[in-house]
């Protein structure tokens, strides 16, 4: 017993001496532990640790749309090689020709365009919303902006954000309704005969980006308000295959916006308020990222969407600098694979 007590006493003395030594060293050196910013944590939107080792490139400025910080959205190439995109606050769809001449296509009343998809007959389908009123619609116009048709009326109750055609001419669209704790949006399918709208993946919080795999059997949706990437395996256009849904990725920070697929099935997701595009393989595994110039200093963070030019691997990213003073710009980068053959560029029968 005395031996055990002696050992305990020695242990207590040893601990006391160690504490005194550490205390004396801290007093002498003034070395109180402190967190400090470094190159990886400085700036408004540092790359999350899990994404820092991804293959990374920096896009180049390609076209200055405006010196004003207008929000750009929804780029899509038409059958003539023109780049169409949305001026959200101006409620306009714009056209940029191959020789970089900019002109308006159409102006919308009471709603702002946010997503575009081109039909193989040349018509431009436009997803548009009024965020203040919580309403939205899908309309279509001829290539010159005339002949506007209502495809999905505001009375249907959706807030269409983005859209993509399947090979049959049916239209998937995302519904931007809801908040993170009240998921009222989702992904829907508008049939090729224009008769029915069918829910495919309901109960999402601000469903945003939507894309199809090259074989048309996987539907991808980003959930803006809950930072999720969903994959839906389709048995047919509106039926989910058994064990066919998965959340393949949880994003960090704000916020997954629009996305596009390439011919290899890779996905490109615009990270709104982060000034970058995250790239995933066909299984939803991150494999790369594209950064926009100036993002570490808080510039060009409002990256919303992108388009891959047909028959090339040229990616064009639309963004705004917000209050940073650099206006609204389209950036360019080369990506893993060529553009997916979209419905817009399929041969008409």
Go through the PLM ranges and name each one.
Residues 232-240, 334-340:
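Short loop/turn segments immediately following beta-strands, especially the blade-tip
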Residues 60-65, 101-107, 147-153, 196-201, ...:
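A short beta-strand motif characteristic of beta-propeller blades
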Residues 65-80, 109-136, 154-171, 178-179, ...:
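Beta-rich, blade/repeat-based domains predominating
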Residues 88-89, 130-136, 178-185, 224-226, ...:
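Short, solvent-exposed loop/turn segments at conserved positions within beta-propeller repeat blades
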Residues 43-69:
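A short helix->beta-strand "capping" segment at the edge of beta-propeller domains
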Residues 92-94, 137-139, 186-188, 228-230, ...:
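A short loop-to-beta-strand structural motif that recurs across blades of beta-propeller domains
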Residues 307-349:
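Blade-level signature of beta-propeller repeat domains, shared across WD40, Kelch, NHL, RCC1
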Residues 12-21:
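Bacterial N-terminal signal peptides
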């Amino acid at each position: 017993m005395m031996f055990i007590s002696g050992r305990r006493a020695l242990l207590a003395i040893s601990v006391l001496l160690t504490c005194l030594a550490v205390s004396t060293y801290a007093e002498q050196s003034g070395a109180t532990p402190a967190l400090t910013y470094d190159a990886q944590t400085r700036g408004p939107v540092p790359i999350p640790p899990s994404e820092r080792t991804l293959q990374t490139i920096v896009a180049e400025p390609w076209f200055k749309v405006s010196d004003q910080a207008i929000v750009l959205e929804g780029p899509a190439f038409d059958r003539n090689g023109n780049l169409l995109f949305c001026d959200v606050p101006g409620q306009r769809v714009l056209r940029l020709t191959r020789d970089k001449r900019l002109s308006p296509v159409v102006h919308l009343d009471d709603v702002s365009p946010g997503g575009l998809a081109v039909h193989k007959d040349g018509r431009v389908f436009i997803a548009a919303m009024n965020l203040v009123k919580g309403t939205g619609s899908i309309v279509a116009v001829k290539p010159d902006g005339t002949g506007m048709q209502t495809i999905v009326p505001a009375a249907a109750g959706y807030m269409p954000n983005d859209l993509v055609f399947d090979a049959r001419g049916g239209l998937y669209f995302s519904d931007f309704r809801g908040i993170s704790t009240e998921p009222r949006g989702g992904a829907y399918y508008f049939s090729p005969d224009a008769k029915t709208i069918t829910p495919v993946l309901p109960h999402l919080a601000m469903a945003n980006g939507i894309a199809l795999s090259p074989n048309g059997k996987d539907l991808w949706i980003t959930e803006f308000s809950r930072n999720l990437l969903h994959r839906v395996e389709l048995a047919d256009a509106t039926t989910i295959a058994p064990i066919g849904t998965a959340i393949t990725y949880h994003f960090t920070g704000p916020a997954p916006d629009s996305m596009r697929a390439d011919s290899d099935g890779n996905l490109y997701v615009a990270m709104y308020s982060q000034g970058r595009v995250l790239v995933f393989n066909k299984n939803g595994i991150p494999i790369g990222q594209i950064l926009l110039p100036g993002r570490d200093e808080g510039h060009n963070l409002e990256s919303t969407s992108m388009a891959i030019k047909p028959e090339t691997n040229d990616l064009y990213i639309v963004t705004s600098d917000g209050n940073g003073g650099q206006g609204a710009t389209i950036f360019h980068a080369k990506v893993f694979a060529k553009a997916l053959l979209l419905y817009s560029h399929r041969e008409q029968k």
